[in-house]
UniProtKB/Swiss-Prot annotation:
Gene3D superfamilies: Aldolase class I
Domain Radical SAM core: from-to ranges: 13-258
Similarity comment: family membership: Belongs to the radical SAM superfamily. CofG family.
Single Gene Ontology MF annotation: iron ion binding
SUPFAM superfamilies: Radical SAM enzymes
Lineage: Archaea, Methanobacteriati, Methanobacteriota, Methanomada group, Methanobacteria
Gene: cofG
Species this chain originates from: Methanobrevibacter smithii (strain ATCC 35061 / DSM 861 / OCM 144 / PS)
Pfam families: Radical_SAM
Co-factor note (free text): Binds 1 [4Fe-4S] cluster. The cluster is coordinated with 3 cysteines and an exchangeable S-adenosyl-L-methionine.
Stated name of the protein: 7,8-didemethyl-8-hydroxy-5-deazariboflavin synthase
Length: 339
């Protein structure tokens, strides 16, 4: 633990004050651990938010001082007829074009910076979305092909590690500041955890676009297929966070641990080398983990200070990427005006 923590550049722990906006809860994947996906026949499902609904949420986020608009949606949601119908009603042929305009609206009509996470995208779609996103992201989750034959991923073609690695690689080729990470406790082995972290390190070494690596622990909840699955132990998380920090010790890549999934143990992970809490919202729930509420910002500050660190707010895009090598003029001007 001490060895991992000593590689810190400073005593700062960062977070991004965001709003979490699910544009649709429809998804082609059906992961055994998922709390996000809903089916079209579910009366509570978000089929597709309107621009007016999104803008109202963004304006509320502005009042709370948020700087990041996190747009999430199920992978290839526009393959579902109900989403297709909504898109056609709104005048669109596909969800990427719609998301592009949502992000453009965010830049033009609010003070927030868009960060899109919608699963795998083609090279062409990533290239388009790069123009209106300060950063993007997608969890690698695991490089284990074996998990494709287990309850975790056997109904989720988009979780094929080859496809996900290609998406993250294409983001690097396009110089998109990118957030990724791994999910532990879904049936992977320690060797597969190591392989997943090494794959992310390889992509960072090749393209330099990985700005943070999330170490996320599976948490069970009622109603999911893996409801009775055993969660990873505290020691599993400690080992993985330390391994991640040591693997990226010679870089400025942040190691992130979600505080809402580790309320009673979060401070320990700071001592293991984690240096980022990720996005924390004062205005919206964590739709991916709805049974795990965010800590308040006051609570987050107390947790951080009590562990001997200083909490500071950051943008969704890390400072090192705020230049014309990574961002276009529109985004750079937007960020300059926010400073």
């Amino acid at each position: 633990m001490n060895k991992a923590s000593k590689y810190r550049e400073n005593n700062l722990i960062t977070y991004s004050k965001n709003i979490f906006i699910p544009l649709t809860e429809i998804c082609k994947n059906d992961c055994g651990y998922c709390n996000f996906k809903k089916t079209p026949d579910d009366p509570s499902a978000i089929i597709l938010k309107t621009k007016e609904e999104v803008l109202a949420s963004l304006k509320e986020a502005e009042r709370y001082g948020c700087s990041e608009a996190l747009f999430t949606f199920g992978e290839d949601a526009d393959e579902e007829e109900s989403v297709q119908q909504k898109l056609a009603e709104f005048g669109y042929e596909n969800i990427v074009d719609y998301v592009f305009d949502i992000c453009k609206m965010t830049l033009e009509e609010t003070s927030l910076l868009p960060h899109t996470n919608g699963g795998n995208f083609s090279y062409e779609s990533l290239k388009k979305l790069k123009e209106v996103n300060a950063s993007m992201g997608m969890m690698l989750e695991s490089t284990s092909v074996r998990l494709m034959n287990t309850v975790a991923h056997n109904k989720s073609p988009g979780k094929n590690p080859e496809i996900r690695l290609k998406t993250i690689s294409n983001a690097g080729k396009l110089k998109i500041p990118y957030t990724t990470g791994i999910l532990i406790g879904i049936g992977e082995t320690k060797e597969e955890i190591a392989d997943s972290l090494l794959a992310i390190r390889d992509l960072y070494d090749k393209y330099g676009h990985i700005q943070e690596v999330i170490i996320q622990n599976f948490t069970t909840s009622p109603g999911i297929e893996m409801e009775n699955w055993e969660e990873p132990t505290f020691l599993d998380m400690v080992r993985t966070v330390i391994a991640g920090k040591l693997l990226f010790r010679d870089t400025d890549v942040s190691i992130q641990v979600p505080p809402n999934l580790n309320h009673d143990t979060a401070q320990i992970f700071l001592l293991c080398g984690a240096d980022d809490w990720g996005g924390v919202s004062p205005v919206s729930p964590d739709y991916v983990n709805p049974t795990s509420p965010w800590p308040t910002l006051d609570e987050l500050n107390r947790l951080t200070q009590d562990a001997g660190f200083e909490l500071i707010e950051r943008m969704c895009v890390y400072e090192k990427y705020v230049n014309d090598k990574w961002l276009n003029e529109t985004l750079l001007e937007k960020i300059a005006n926010l400073s």
